[in-house]
A protein has these predicted regions:
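Extracellular/luminal regions of secreted and cell-surface proteins that mediate adhesion/ECM remodeling
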Residues: 1-18
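Terminal beta-strand-rich extracellular "head" domains
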Residues: 17-24, 28-98, 102-144
């Protein structure tokens, strides 16, 4: 993954069609992940291709919108730990058209970084600590 590039995470998306344009959409989920040592993984959610992560706007023209940041092996305690990062927020799509929510990642330190989803970096078979995991995104309409 190239530094500061927004990349969609395959399989972590959904569509919902609000019945009224005044209704809200509650979006929640979690990401199971591991990344290279001394690297940073930032996660975001987009609506119809636009990053709508609910934490702070970009400042100074160079920061990305992201809802969580994780340090590489400093945070993961090694290349065998799978971290689980939850997210949740209320969105106001203001439409009755189909809306697609997509989870993505931004790597933040150097180019050629690796981010593993639902597994560890090492991913060694037959050990008691290299687990496989799942990630999830769920949304439901809330009357507004």
């Amino acid at each position: 993954v190239t530094q500061n590039q927004e990349v969609n995470i395959t399989g972590l998306s959904l569509t919902i069609k609000p019945s009224r344009s005044s209704n809200l959409v509650w979006v929640q989920g979690f990401i199971s992940h591991n990344c290279d040592s001394n690297q940073q993984a930032h996660f975001f959610v987009s609506r119809n291709g636009t990053n709508i992560s609910p934490i702070g706007d970009a400042g100074g023209g160079n920061q990305k919108r992201a809802f969580v940041s994780a340090q590489g092996n400093q945070d993961y305690m090694g290349n065998w730990v799978v971290k689980n990062t939850p997210f949740w927020f209320m969105d106001t799509p203001a439409t009755t058209s189909t809306v697609t929510y997509q989870v993505g990642a931004i790597m933040g330190v150097t180019n050629s970084q690796y981010l593993w989803i639902n597994r560890s970096q090492r991913d060694t078979s037959g050990t008691g600590y290299d687990m496989r995991a799942v990630s999830n995104i769920t949304a439901w309409e809330v009357s507004g």
